[in-house]
Amino acid sequence: MRCLELNWEIMNKDSSNFLYKYWLKGCEFYNKKDYDKAIEYFSLSNKIFKENVPKCDYYGLREEAYKEILNNNIEEGIKKFDWFVEGILADGDYYNLSGELSTIASIFAKIGKLDITKNFLNSGGEWIYNDVIKDANSEDILKSVLTFDFSYEERKEILNREPHLRKLFEDNIYNFNSDFFDFMMMFFIGAGNWKRFLEVYEEFKNKIKSCQISNEIVNEIIKRFDKSMSDLLAIAHLLKENYEKCLYYVMLFKEYFDLDEFNEIEKNKINLIVDIAYNLKNGNVKKEEWLNRLNEIYKEIIKRPLPNTYKDAHNDDLLNEILDYYVLKEFIEKKL
């Protein structure tokens, strides 16, 4: 059962302050690349939530938190949003986490609090990694990838070549959810965290390579997954300054997806990434030109004020585009 309304004023302020304190401490360790220590503090933060709000509808905090942001009470807004996110994590509701965390991160990016944006995205991504990815069974991953990234006919052909894999499909139980993996990777890229993104992606590929299948099949599976993740991989390698790989993944993206199905912002973003990578590969820096193009692409998002309510912000598809804007802007501004 859930209570109908959550009143922040009657909640235990000590608990909310401790929760916020542990979350910030976790973010501090995370930014030092001490991921194990960070998750210890994130877990403490979530434990406090579970012990203090066992029956309440924490979704009620979204609008309260958003009002704090609009009234420039930033720290109070962070605390309430953090409490809300802890509730989603406690429920393991990663489908809702995907949309809600993207909205929250975009709100803080919109008001220029990029450190908070990164903290929310990184902590959410790392939580999914520890809960879903880190100890995932290699065969569970393989089964999920073959099911959701390959057609029935393609999968049938692979099983004919590797008949021992048929045992994986003797039931309809899936212990690995590839959607959660996608959410995690989107969080890392939204935070500009290309190092963690590539590190986890390599770990994921190694799990597939560890399965008892031929190298030929392994390469087919990894290339298919590379294609499905190609837009994120292109950004990751741009940020890493590996421009050849960035251009390669853009090529894969165009091969796998129909650009005409994307909005103008996405199409122009991809074209800008290609131009940046191609020029930097050849030693040409066009910082002002790229910044001008970037601002032109995202001008509608930049000039629009935040919506009046959290609900409106959550339903604003354009607002979520702002994460890519700041990731690319930060990268371009670091160029000479």
Swiss-Prot record:
Gene3D superfamilies: Tetratricopeptide repeat domain (1.25.40.10). It comes from the Archaea. Pfam families: TPR_3 (PF07720). This is Uncharacterized protein MJ1348. It comes from Methanocaldococcus jannaschii (strain ATCC 43067 / DSM 2661 / JAL-1 / JCM 10045 / NBRC 100440). The lineage of its organism: Archaea, Methanobacteriati, Methanobacteriota, Methanomada group, Methanococci.
